[in-house]
């Protein structure tokens, strides 16, 4: 039985990737790697240091001098930036609306991809993001492309924000998600596209548990 496989999950904002990836990782006793949190951490630090988000060279220089650690905890994965817990800070509306701008820079992606590949080198990982199957883990044994309608993804984000105590408008969230889809799919550096060998999973009408079970079934087949 091949145990330490790599599972790559890609998809647009609000598709449920992180929530479902965490459940899959826990069920398989795998490590979960949230690549989106890494890009959010870079965005947050740049904003804190007043670095212009279009300044690729400065962003790359800042990132090269930074440490981003992902640590499991009973409350879920915690994100540490230069030793400080920024798990809540990186989920702000300001960071959410700016992260695609930072992620579009090839030098930033290059540095983070190297870190992500190192984390996944020994397998036994579930990694989610925008370009995992197409770029970061091209040889992953299981590749999933997860999506849902813009309306459903906005509804989920709205509920998440309410739980976190973040004020948001459902209509504005729909606009932001549609814009982020456009930015992510049209960027030059590793655009959001489905890998040829990825399995498409539409989560619009699926519960979180149903989607996780579908992936677990596929994972078990790959591990035989």
Swiss-Prot record:
One of its GO terms (cellular component) is cytosol. Keywords: ATP-binding, Cytoplasm, Kinase, Nucleotide-binding, Transferase. It is found in: Cytoplasm. GO terms for biological process: nucleobase-containing small molecule interconversion; pyrimidine nucleotide metabolic process. InterPro entries: Cytidylate_kin, Cytidylate_kinase_dom, P-loop_NTPase. CDD domains: CMPK (cd02020). Its main location: cytoplasm. GO terms for molecular function: ATP binding; CMP kinase activity; dCMP kinase activity. It comes from the Bacteria. ATP binds at residues 11-19. It is an enzyme of class 2 (transferase). Pfam families: Cytidylate_kin. It catalyses: CMP + ATP = CDP + ADP; dCMP + ATP = dCDP + ADP. Its EC number is 2.7.4.25. HAMAP family: Cytidyl_kinase_type1. Belongs to the cytidylate kinase family. Type 1 subfamily. PANTHER family: CYTIDYLATE KINASE, CYTIDYLATE KINASE/PANTOATE-BETA-ALANINE LIGASE. This is Cytidylate kinase. It comes from Lysinibacillus sphaericus (strain C3-41). The lineage of its organism: Bacteria, Bacillati, Bacillota, Bacilli, Bacillales. The gene is cmk.
């Amino acid at each position: 039985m091949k145990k330490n496989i790599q599972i790559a999950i890609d998809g647009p904002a609000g598709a449920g990737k992180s929530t479902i990836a965490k459940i899959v990782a826990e069920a398989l006793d795998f490590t979960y790697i949230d690549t989106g949190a890494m890009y959010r951490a870079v965005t947050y630090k740049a904003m804190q240091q007043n670095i212009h988000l279009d300044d690729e060279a400065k962003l790359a220089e800042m990132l090269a001098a930074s440490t981003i650690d992902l640590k499991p905890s009973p409350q879920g994965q915690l994100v540490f930036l230069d030793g400080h817990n920024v798990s809540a800070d990186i989920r702000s509306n300001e960071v959410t609306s700016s992260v695609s701008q930072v992620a579009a820079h090839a030098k930033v992606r290059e540095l983070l991809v190297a870190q992500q590949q190192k984390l996944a080198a020994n397998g036994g990982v579930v990694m989610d993001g925008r370009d995992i199957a197409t770029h970061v883990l091209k040889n992953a044994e299981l590749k999933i492309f997860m999506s849902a309608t813009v309306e459903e993804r906005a509804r989920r984000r709205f509920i998440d924000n309410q739980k976190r105590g973040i004020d948001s408008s459902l209509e504005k969230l729909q606009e932001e998600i549609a814009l982020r889809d456009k930015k992510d799919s049209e960027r030059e550096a590793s655009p959001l596209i489905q890998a040829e060998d990825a399995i498409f999973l539409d989560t619009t009408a699926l519960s979180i548990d149903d989607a996780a079970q579908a992936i677990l079934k596929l994972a078990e087949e790959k591990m035989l």
